[in-house]
Amino acid sequence: MENTGSRELVIKEIKLFNKWSYDFIEVRDPSLKKYICLKPVYLPHTGGRHEHRRFGKTHVPIVERLINKVMRPGRNMGKKHLAYHIVKKAFDIIHIKTGENPIQVLVRAIENAAPREETTRIMYGGITYHVSVDVAPLRRIDLALRHLTEGARMKAFHSPIPIEEALAEEIVLAASNDPKSYAIQKKEEIERIALSSR
């Protein structure tokens, strides 16, 4: 017996949290393009498989890296499920506030909050000097994510504002390059110190 009905293989589009599409997300900063992973995933959880490879972090989805930064030592340490829900709710709030894809808003916030220059300590003849150096792209992303989550944590700590709202607000402010954002303030402070120690 022959089956005359043709079967079509329907591949659903992979969306983050089953809501946000990875299509048309652009990274404007050419130095960060290679290091911001926008590989489509349903659930941003790689289980630390990148850990033992050099530059393994470049293959971890950027949203998972944000989730991992939310999971800081102290109250939220090791609670990835809690951090996952914080970021998920924050993305919903970002979409309500801006009307844009939250992944694109996050990428824009990282580009704006990533410092280009910082200082390092060099010992020369028994005296320590602070010398201005360029920041590696991977470190730029790490610093931007750290400052975004630090700002949200500081805003929500001892405050009636939930962490989800604080994180969403911090990301939106950083995406619009607003000086009220903690991440933008830290970036400008780091670059100002680096400029003075050239």
Swiss-Prot record:
<comment type="function">
    <text>One of the primary rRNA binding proteins, it binds directly to 16S rRNA where it nucleates assembly of the head domain of the 30S subunit. Is located at the subunit interface close to the decoding center.</text>
</comment>
<dbReference type="InterPro" id="IPR036823">
    <property type="entry name" value="Ribosomal_uS7_dom_sf"/>
</dbReference>
<keyword id="KW-0699">rRNA-binding</keyword>
<dbReference type="InterPro" id="IPR005716">
    <property type="entry name" value="Ribosomal_uS7_euk/arc"/>
</dbReference>
<comment type="subunit">
    <text>Part of the 30S ribosomal subunit.</text>
</comment>
<dbReference type="InterPro" id="IPR000235">
    <property type="entry name" value="Ribosomal_uS7"/>
</dbReference>
<dbReference type="GO" id="GO:0015935">
    <property type="term" value="C:small ribosomal subunit"/>
</dbReference>
<dbReference type="InterPro" id="IPR020606">
    <property type="entry name" value="Ribosomal_uS7_CS"/>
</dbReference>
<keyword id="KW-0687">Ribonucleoprotein</keyword>
<keyword id="KW-0694">RNA-binding</keyword>
<dbReference type="InterPro" id="IPR023798">
    <property type="entry name" value="Ribosomal_uS7_dom"/>
</dbReference>
<dbReference type="GO" id="GO:0019843">
    <property type="term" value="F:rRNA binding"/>
</dbReference>
<dbReference type="GO" id="GO:0003735">
    <property type="term" value="F:structural constituent of ribosome"/>
</dbReference>
<dbReference type="Pfam" id="PF00177">
    <property type="entry name" value="Ribosomal_S7"/>
</dbReference>
<dbReference type="GO" id="GO:0006412">
    <property type="term" value="P:translation"/>
</dbReference>
<comment type="similarity">
    <text>Belongs to the universal ribosomal protein uS7 family.</text>
</comment>
<keyword id="KW-0689">Ribosomal protein</keyword>
<dbReference type="InterPro" id="IPR026018">
    <property type="entry name" value="Ribosomal_uS7_arc"/>
</dbReference>
<protein>
    <recommendedName>
        <fullName>Small ribosomal subunit protein uS7</fullName>
    </recommendedName>
</protein>
